[in-house]
């Protein structure tokens, strides 16, 4: 009788043991080099933001947290460790994210896509580059050539769509080969590949390092792309407040990037080795992508497209129920806890705005179609100019003063994305005003319509100096 009572007491005690007494693992897989994931990993880790939001009340009153971080160069190995139960969270793009969901389903489990981190509803971020010595100026010139790409990546999806738009057979009219970005960089430098398609940040990083030239931007395919955060569903149901805490940390990281993009671009460089001027292309105002945490319809569409393409590539043998795989309840809760309006942000499609005065005139910049910027070495802030003419004139003066230049940016007149100005093409209108474009063909089309001329960076700079 006493034994039975003792056992009953033990069972009762075990059933009422507070959850808060346990040690809760928070294992997060990041892709540090995929710099548009910074608000979902690198910055949270480096700035210790997660600790600020982890719950310490209710069932978590006496809980302790074991936070683990692991960095990956792509989404596939990250997914493998999530499925194996070694990671709870992961940050990756739409294609590997879709594969993550399929891999979990295949293993009899479920993962959830809980937040967007950064993206473009048009497709910017993915791109195609050629060796800097190549004469190729557009994708149409690559018929019959070899194009490498990380297989089954978001860039692979972009490449297949771009090939389809050209009317090509991807198995006959172009030779698509699998190649990771770290291998592709060497291949481009050695002219061993005709072109390379890749995801963030390589279509900007390789040109910035001088051995490649961008000839196609993902926005030309008009196919949404994004990177986001996933979590193991079982973990999310058990530790809902921890998931919300992770997303609140991401929201703060996002706000910090918006407020001081140069400062945090420098931090990203310190951690990854990817130059701050490339990081600023994405995280600065009017950037290549928009840091975004809400589930816009276009991003939901991107996941569906990714699943269909993965099935076509025979990398997935099943579909996914997007309504259950994409779960926005956690990011909605994080927005509410952070005092933000999710519905309002869901309807907001504007790029991170530029609130700046022209560095020469001091007047507020109100027309962003011809904006240019200069990052002077040793200066903590980027200088902003209302036009390329003003920037190029200032550039000449800065060089005469002995200043070194980290980067010069120009805003593409058609797509609105930020470009490395020394890689861009320029066209004048009838009044001689400069507009920037990624492609020579785009500049030629504009010049023809406006009665102007096409100029490369060197000629555009010389024209601006001569006109002042």
Q: At which residue positions do the language-model features occur?
A:
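Sec/Tat signal peptide C-region and signal peptidase I cleavage site
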Residues: 15-21
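Short, glycine-/small- and polar/acidic-enriched structural segments
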Residues: 22-169, 175-178, 194, 223
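Secondary-structure end/capping motifs
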Residues: 34-35, 238-317
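A bilobed periplasmic-binding-protein/Venus flytrap-type ligand-binding module shared by bacterial periplasmic
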Residues: 44, 125-135, 225-241, 427-429
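Ligand-binding clefts/hinges and TM-proximal coupling segments of bilobed small-molecule sensing domains
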Residues: 63, 146, 150-162, 166, ...
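Pocket-lining segment of extracytoplasmic ligand-binding domains
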Residues: 105, 177, 182-271, 389, ...
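Conserved C-terminal helix/tail region of periplasmic/extracytoplasmic solute-binding proteins
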Residues: 310-355
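Short cysteine-rich clusters marking metal-coordination/redox-active sites
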Residues: 358-361
